[in-house]
């Protein structure tokens, strides 16, 4: 049997798997798995250079299903291609604890490169992986051994490409001339509510051409020869990324809904029996023929042979380049130097600098200790102060640069940084003003969901921003970030706490961290030992001022308000303890004995001070405690004036303690 015939059989049987899985659970999305089946057949049956027996192979092609709602497309092809995804798991689609969740999830399913579902994120992730691949080649390839030379493919639909994050990411990909990236556009002219022309009229392919992509259009998206030829041209292109518009029929194989918005979801599954007959499939559900099984078993063996050839080259590279090999190993295992905290120089006792400015010295010290540390910014390196000196920028002509210039594209920055983290090897970060963290929130949420070891630098953290006014004063942002599960949010008080914050972010390999830094200068709190401050951040909270005699009042604070709390405590008396809580999440993870030593239950007289909304502090101060916060938007005036006007002063903290009967 000719390969073309067997691939068509595979495409139709993949359609059958999708129909049966979605019919069995009465939910899911049929449109893409049926409409793009021939695309899947060519990718997994012919084009992708992967090793299904090892889905972590370093030089594998990356395939990202950006349109994650079409997850049965991916699960069906991963099963057929021989990944560790048994048919029983396909049958368990969308069931509790299965390997086939409703949308693809990184770490849950072999062969799934990243979590997708929120449309457009996968395009940004793919751009990040393509950047990481170029970085890896620049850092590790030699003239004798090319160990990184794979491609990145993303399958996206109309919904993905209508999202702003995809537009931002694609614009940057074109600018960087990422010739290892191919975006496959499942162009079926349908969205969920209606035909696509009800909400868009531009030429998408022309838009991508303007971004700097090589573009082509396949009029019949079910013509596998045309798809294969286009993919070959994309792989051969060494000048720019490729965009292939593939005209498909949504829900092809179910005549009752094919080509209509009704074919998007699970509705067509009720025609499952008739659809199987139309596709030439037997009555048996979840049917895969012996011929298709044999074809993919043979292909898996061929891919294994190619992998063995790469392994031999890789072994020779390791032998010839032991230092590069050791660096690569450290990146893969996400090693952090044991003495990382000591690699950051201490600040002068009388230093008076913004924590963002302190971060400049810190990240440059850390970059020397961690050669795979990457720092990016959304056109704000000069303000966020996270530019790494003497390592260059990543550009289309310099793939070894370690600074990423994202432009004013916060959302894409979040998705691209996620893609670099998914790739492994590098430790990426991004930076913008704290108030713009909401522009990237979906990407931040996904990084937390997947436990990606990245960190974000969010500066200009409060009403102290001043004259720019309430549009740029993030009173609610820190609290809004703290409620994202598995995201550590650290708001350091001074330069030494900031050193601890950066190190905490890098030491954490099971999730993301956000650093909330000041625009305004803050004093170095040298009355507290340096190591106490640095190591205290690692625990999330610590005693910054020990009471004398009986403990009568605890004041908790974070960031720039720690100094305010310390000054207020001096006025309130010697029986006042001040606790610095730069990171609630880290503090809450400490064992009960440590938390009790810092916040003893026996002392219920508590107050908290932070220049932001007060809500989350109430879990520490209790029903009778007081929070001196800012539960309103700010105003335009010099920062000190705004702080005073909104109650962020020593006198007001003392006053509020007295009014609540909390005075020591």
Q: Where do the model's predicted regions map?
A:
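Cofactor-binding active-site loop characterized by glycine-rich and histidine/acidic residues
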Residues: 35-175, 387-388, 420
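Acidic-glycine-rich active-site phosphate/pyrophosphate-binding loop
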Residues: 4-15, 48-50, 87-108, 381-395, ...
